[in-house]
Amino acid sequence: MKNIAAQMVNFDREQMRRIANNMPEQYDEKPQVQQVAQIINGVFSQLLATFPASLANRDQNEVNEIRRQWVLAFRENGITTMEQVNAGMRVARRQNRPFLPSPGQFVAWCREEASVTAGLPNVSELVDMVYEYCRKRGLYPDAESYPWKSNAHYWLVTNLYQNMRANALTDAELRRKAADELVHMTARINRGEAIPEPVKQLPVMGGRPLNRAQALAKIAEIKAKFGLKGASV
């Protein structure tokens, strides 16, 4: 029951349709299909028990559609292990409202709790770390001299910082990138991979082109810094 990735990949469309619509499965002597079905149904039952107001005044067709959306969300977002599901359920049980979260919210809970279990920050904490690094980086000769709590923190923050600078990321874009970085780093740690120590990195060049106002401001900054004179652009 620890890893159902292979079963989920091989779980054919008809079986998924039958489970989503609360119909009996057709196993064709495939015990792994029954196992996947039991896991999905068990998770859905836990969610409904945790959020009892979710199905109030809903008919069976609506319930079936909710089940279908959850099945699809698990498959599309790689929620393939009971460890991931249990991580999401730990967050779900801490909620103080009786309504079922969206499939996307539950997937985010699975990932966030998995990251925390692996010794990493959650998305909000990681973004705060990036902003703090932006404020304090000038106090240190280089990124490698910054007081990182772990090798993983170094790679997460510096990668996001470079991406933010190169592509002028908004706060919302930075948070999406942070979520992606945490998924990858969590997977590396869970595989037992040794995260390398900080090493000097070349600056990331390129990214989004500047508009005219930004270009003029950058030119003025360079002129002021080096005491240059010349005609305006």
UniProtKB/Swiss-Prot annotation:
The keyword Transmembrane does not apply. It holds the Pfam family Phage_lambda_P. The keyword Disulfide bond does not apply. Keywords: DNA replication, Host-virus interaction, Viral DNA replication. Transmembrane segments: none annotated. GO terms for biological process: bidirectional double-stranded viral DNA replication; DNA replication initiation. Loads (host) replicative DNA helicase DnaB onto single-stranded (ss)DNA at the origin of replication. Reconfigures the DnaB hexameric ring, generating an opening large enough to permit ssDNA into the central channel. Necessary for the bidirectional replication of lambda DNA. It interacts with the ori (origin of replication) region of the genome during the initiation of replication. Forms a (host) DnaB(6):lambda P(5) complex in the presence of ssDNA. Belongs to the phage P protein family. This is Helicase loader. It comes from Escherichia phage lambda.
